């Protein structure tokens, strides 16, 4: 089956055909590092991590660029407010501190590092070059009030609105700059002239005067700098579709770049049925989320909904994810113990880097616009079938299903047995539990051999009360947690 992705520009499912055979270039709008990361940031980054992993599984060489917006009105304003409250942190220090918070949160969730992670402040020259081309082509104009602002002339670009299918007359005024010298209220800032009272370190020299770039031009410059004038996929949150992505597309095309061939947008997060927002006071910060559950559980939850749908967070959401992941983990543990020492023992992972094959139904789901919910259904069906095979003593079938489950969780990045999810505290606890349970099982076996069935039954009952299930078979006794 051919991979199909929902292209926001055409509002349709399209067969994915890379610009260069065997290679994929992806640009994802990263965070504006003004304040601590929240669940919405994590959900977006994880959606494109799933896409990247699936493309890599299909044998494509993926270059993923995720930017850091480290210069912006919000960054400057937050630093100023901190200083007014008695702090000393400069805007650039705030941006770097918050950037590290994002990096730690991404790493905790197993989100693969991007191929490139450029900061906006490192591409000022590329931004000015695009602005210069737009001015030369008649699609941008310097303000005539001496402010140093440069605006994109929306009236000069008839295709403006093509991404969101809006008519120019229906669009709202651009809210990213003062309207002091705009020709049209929809025109947006490409370059913002320095204002009195702003830190000198937040301005760069330019042909139009000292200032800093507008938000939209930053992504146009960084994407084409690292991926070229035309690249495969541009991704980001649904809330960026307008005006940010609409403006990116317009200014890039007007400057002569073909730009992105596919546009993907992930859905937002709702908390107790309400859209998450600072104004409602219902933001869920990454640090709190990661403190409330194991990171792999958080990753499972964030990636369990279709990437284009709204992700609903409620009080029991993480508990449900924990239960689902526990079913996977206990099957993998149980099957590993049952198969150990048999001819069906799990083989070590291939050393040539080739991923293990996933079931056809799983691949079909992922090829259908990354239908992760359907892929997870295939995964859990395999877990149930694997447990049934173990119950029936069919080790060959159990081994086959274990291989399927292992391949699927590896592709999704949620293998609960992977070293990356084993914390320093997990390892000793697991070893201690295993030693204690196996010691009691050995005592039970000794009692059975001595025909002391009362003691053997008492040991079984004690373990059952602790959530340990014992299964007796001709090959010996095996144990599992919580009714594996």
UniProtKB/Swiss-Prot annotation:
Its EC number is 6.1.1.16. Zn(2+) binds at residues 29, 219, 244, 248. Monomer. It comes from Clavibacter sepedonicus (Clavibacter michiganensis subsp. sepedonicus). It catalyses: tRNA(Cys) + L-cysteine + ATP = L-cysteinyl-tRNA(Cys) + AMP + diphosphate. Belongs to the class-I aminoacyl-tRNA synthetase family. A motif ('KMSKS' region) lies at residues 275-279. Pfam families: CysS_C, DALR_2, tRNA-synt_1e. Keywords: Aminoacyl-tRNA synthetase, ATP-binding, Cytoplasm, Ligase, Metal-binding, Nucleotide-binding, Protein biosynthesis, Zinc. The lineage of its organism: Bacteria, Bacillati, Actinomycetota, Actinomycetes, Micrococcales. InterPro entries: Cys-tRNA-ligase, Cys-tRNA-synt_Ia_DALR, Cys-tRNA/MSH_ligase, CysS_C, Rossmann-like_a/b/a_fold, tRNA-synt_1_cat_dom, tRNAsynth_Ia_anticodon-bd. It is found in: Cytoplasm. A motif ('HIGH' region) lies at residues 31-41. CDD domains: CysRS_core (cd00672). It is an enzyme of class 6 (ligase). GO terms for biological process: cysteinyl-tRNA aminoacylation. It comes from the Bacteria. This is Cysteine--tRNA ligase. Binds 1 zinc ion per subunit. NCBIfam families: cysS. Its cofactor is Zn(2+). One of its GO terms (molecular function) is zinc ion binding. PANTHER family: CYSTEINE--TRNA LIGASE, CYSTEINYL-TRNA SYNTHETASE. ATP binds at residue 278. One of its GO terms (cellular component) is cytosol.
């Amino acid at each position: 089956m051919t991979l199909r992705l929902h292209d926001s520009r055409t509002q349709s499912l399209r067969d994915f055909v890379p610009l260069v055979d065997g290679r994929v270039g992806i640009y994802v709008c990263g965070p504006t590092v003004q304040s601590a990361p929240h669940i919405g940031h994590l959900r977006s980054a994880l959606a494109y991590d799933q896409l990247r992993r699936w493309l890599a599984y299909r044998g494509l060489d993926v270059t993923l660029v995720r930017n850091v917006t480290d210069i912006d009105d919000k960054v400057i304003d937050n630093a100023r407010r901190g200083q007014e409250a008695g702090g000393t942190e400069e805007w650039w220090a705030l941006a770097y501190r918050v950037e590290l918070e994002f990096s730690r949160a991404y790493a905790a969730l197993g989100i693969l590092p991007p191929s490139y992670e450029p900061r906006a402040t490192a591409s000022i020259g590329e931004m000015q070059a695009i602005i210069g081309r737009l001015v030369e082509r008649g699609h941008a104009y310097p303000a005539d009030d001496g402010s140093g602002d440069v605006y994109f002339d929306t009236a000069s670009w008839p295709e403006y609105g093509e991404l969101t299918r809006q008519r120019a007359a229906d669009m709202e005024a651009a809210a990213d700059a003062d309207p002091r010298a705009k020709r049209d209220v929809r025109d947006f800032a490409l370059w913002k002239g320095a204002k009195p009272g702003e830190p000198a370190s937040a301005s760069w020299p330019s042909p139009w005067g000292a200032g800093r770039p507008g938000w939209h031009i930053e992504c146009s410059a960084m994407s084409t700098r690292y991926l070229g004038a035309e690249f495969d996929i541009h991704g980001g949150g649904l809330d960026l579709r307008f005006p940010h992505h609409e403006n990116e597309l317009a200014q890039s095309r007007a400057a002569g770049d073909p730009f992105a061939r596919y546009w993907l947008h992930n859905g937002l997060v709702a908390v107790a049925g309400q859209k998450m927002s600072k104004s409602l006071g219902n933001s869920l910060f990454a640090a709190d989320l990661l403190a409330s559950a194991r990171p792999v559980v958080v990753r499972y939850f964030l990636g369990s909904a279709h990437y284009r749908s709204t992700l609903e967070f409620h009080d029991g959401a993480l508990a449900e994810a924990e239960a689902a992941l526990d079913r996977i983990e206990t099957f993998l543990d149980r099957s590993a113990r049952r198969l150990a020492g048999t001819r069906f023992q799990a083989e070590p992972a291939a050393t040539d880097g080739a991923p293990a094959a996933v079931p056809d139904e799983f691949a079909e789901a992922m090829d259908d616009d990354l239908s992760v919910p359907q892929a997870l259904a295939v995964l859990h069906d395999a877990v149930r079938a694997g447990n049934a095979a173990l119950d029936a003593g069919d080790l060959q079938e159990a081994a086959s299903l274990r291989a399927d489950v292992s391949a699927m969780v590896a592709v999704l990045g949620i293998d609960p047995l992977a070293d990356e999810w084993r914390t320093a505290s997990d390892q000793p606890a697991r070893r201690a539990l295993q030693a204690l349970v196996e010691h009691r099982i050995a005592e039970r076996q000794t009692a059975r051999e001595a025909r002391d069935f009362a003691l053997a039954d008492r040991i079984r009952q004690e373990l059952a009360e602790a959530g340990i299930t014992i299964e007796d078979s001709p090959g010996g006794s095996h144990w599992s947690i919580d009714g594996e």
